[in-house]
């Protein structure tokens, strides 16, 4: 029987980071993964999405902005096979890098599906393995609604397996995955329609920024269909898929993509044998230290439903290993002021509270809001002027910055530095005292009045 100090069930970003940090501190660590290392992010999420987003950015630049910069594009041809080949080569290099980090840190890789036998014992491929500490980092998978014909729809996982782009696609969902896929496919030349249940996309984001994005989607001729609740999917004889909605309308597309949320990967883990419990939403219940209800068993990342972002899982995992193996007994992940980017067209960057959240937290009378709206210089010299919208939210007499939100060209690369400032408790006066970099979009954040 193999024995370890710590094991991760799941070889995604969170599990890998946790075990590598534990190994750095001398722990006997192992990662159990039945599929490819890297999890959703590397294989079916952040990485392939971002590469395709870059491709869409290039297509947008050639089509919309190139002519006004003096570049003609009559002969430009897009070959998706080339993008796909280079995307997959990059992903392969990323996956291969894990073997090197495991070797440096003494982490063992075990291929197979794990299930609990008891609180300190798991079974993999018929073999029993024991560990003092077990981390559940199994991630999540796309949720597919229970409607007739749902199986004729696909998910984001399937999109990244396409060998060629379709002529048309219908995306169902209003979250960041739906918005990002819609933008990417639209700008790569696919007839893309986005269907949402209510009247807004990204409903948890600041309304000022979301309004701006929806205006840009309209200008870019990306159809957004509101108040559309799918009732049934049907496969037509020509291979296309027809969606029937509750309002008695319908739509036909080559592919239908479900982007309706994600569910935790807890099936077949035999959690009952270990005594691990789920919360009311079906995610593994943990406290602020990533502890489950069973001592020695932890969970982090998407399987907990807490801020489902790759860097959050990585940070939580490294912090856990610092607590367990480096004497930092009070170390825990701080889930406040986590910066987030939506790779839409244009991108959204945000950190801290929305206006609505700030009003609830501090009281409407105690907050102050600053906004700025302009056309980014990159697009302002062209016929396709793209708006940028920036917003600062401050609280209290000292005007502590509690929320920063941006929509516009380059926002995705701006937000990290401002997140540091907000994490440190910067005030509006601190922002005002900072000399602007001109001409940039980011200068708007330090010149608002």
Residue map of PLM features:
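A Rossmann-like FAD-binding core segment of flavoenzymes
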Residues: 111, 115-123, 129, 188-288, ...
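FAD-site-proximal beta/loop scaffold in flavoenzymes
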Residues: 151-166, 251-327
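Beta1/beta-strand and adjacent pyrophosphate-binding region of the FAD-binding site
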Residues: 1-12, 165-172
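Glycine-rich flavin
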Residues: 2-4, 20-27, 32-165, 198-202, ...
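A conserved FAD-binding loop/helix module that cradles the flavin
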Residues: 212, 300-359, 430, 438-449
